[in-house]
Design a protein with these regions (language model features):
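An active-site-proximal beta-strand-loop segment
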Residues: 139, 143-182
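Short, basic alpha-helical/linker "hinge" immediately adjacent to a nucleic-acid-recognition surface
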Residues: 3-74, 78, 82-83, 89
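RNase H-like two-metal-ion nuclease catalytic core shared by retroviral integrases
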Residues: 215-217, 222-225, 237-260, 267-279
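Mobile genetic element proteins and their domesticated derivatives, centered on retroelements
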Residues: 22, 67, 80, 97, ...
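Active-site beta-loop-alpha junctions of metal-dependent nucleic acid enzymes
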Residues: 164-167, 184-206
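C-terminal domain-tail junction helix/linker
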Residues: 262-311
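Basic, flexible linker segments flanking DNA-binding modules
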Residues: 40-45, 91-149
């Protein structure tokens, strides 16, 4: 109709649509070089849209069942999708899963309660933090080998403590930078001697695989030389109030808080519960690991090293 002398208003009336539809159709399907409406281009685009519409994601009951199961295991929608790809299991996008979760909430469901709380503001540790003081013979992170930053080898660890309600009780957290593997132990307090002993005991099975440990400047790590000697490793410290230099450990502590929230009385947390949390985190797929679990990544690195050295 554009080839005959008809106005866009007349065309709209002739085919029974609003005039705005005609303008939109012409704008959407004009040839980029000539600037003229191209009916062949319009048809190709329409056919493509029809095919894409047919490809619209289908969220099957089997998928929903899997999502519910993995949400209960504390996986995020993104982790669920990534892990499904690793296992070659069909799954919708994480955006679709989120929409389904919020729809469930509007209908009175509780799936949203399995999501981690998002949007927490980042804050550096400041002078309000107690327990900072002089640590003899500390070696700063600047002297740590550059290979540690590459996160390619197992055995470069970060260590920290989480404090309980009213500063009573503590939890020791150790994690590997390359695999995100974590060791969690309950402490009666933050005295340096028991912290050193528990650290050595927790890592005894991987002693021969450890290269470095990096800590913050808490006085609980004042016996770092004992740890370094007994594990035969090098021990380093972040710059004061530079907790982001232990980014992996800070992230791990956030994951642990999912199970042990701030203000929790640690006397109510059993060693059995601590072990359950450790196992859960070590078997949770991680995005940065290509949705492998820390335990799977650990085995992968160890196997690669075995092949490389012919053992």
């Amino acid at each position: 109709m554009l080839q005959v002398p008809m106005s866009k208003k007349d065309i709209a009336e002739a085919i029974g649509v609003d005039r705005s539809n005609i303008y939109r159709e012409i704008k959407r399907n004009c040839d980029s070089r000539s600037g003229k409406y191209n009916p062949d281009l319009a048809q190709r685009k329409a056919d493509k849209r029809k095919v894409e519409k047919k490809r619209k994601e289908v969220f099957t009951q089997a998928m929903k069942k899997r999502v519910k199961k993995l949400l209960r295991k504390d996986l995020s929608p993104e982790q669920i999708v990534g892990r499904s790809q690793v296992e070659n299991i069909a799954m919708v996008s994480h955006e679709t899963i989120y929409c389904w979760i919020w729809q469930d909430k509007r209908q009175g469901g509780d799936l949203h309660k399995s999501l981690r709380r998002q949007g927490r503001k980042y804050s550096k540790r400041g002078s309000k933090n107690a327990g900072r003081g002089f640590i003899p013979n500390r070696v700063e992170i600047d002297q740590r080998p550059s290979i540690v930053e590459q996160k390619e080898r197992f055995g470069d660890l970060e260590i920290d403590t989480i404090i309980g309600k009213n500063h009573k009780g503590a939890i020791l957290t150790i994690n590997d930078r390359a695999t995100s593997r974590v060791w969690i132990r309950k402490l009666s307090g933050k005295e340096a001697i028991p912290v050193a002993k528990i650290t050595v005991w927790a890592l005894r099975k991987v002693k021969n695989l450890i290269h470095t440990i990096t800590a913050d400047n808490g006085k609980e790590f004042a016996k770092h030389e004992d740890i370094a000697q007994k594990l035969d490793i090098n021990f380093y410290f972040c710059k004061p109030y530079h907790s982001w230099e232990r980014g992996a450990n800070e992230n791990t502590n956030g994951l642990i808080r999912q199970y042990i929230p701030k203000g929790k009385d640690f006397s109510e947390v059993t060693n059995k519960r601590i072990k359950w949390i450790e196992n859960n985190l070590n078997n949770r797929p991680r995005k940065r690991l290509g949705y492998l679990t820390p335990n799977e990544k650990f085995k992968q690195i160890i196997n690669m090293n075995s092949v490389a050295f012919g053992t």
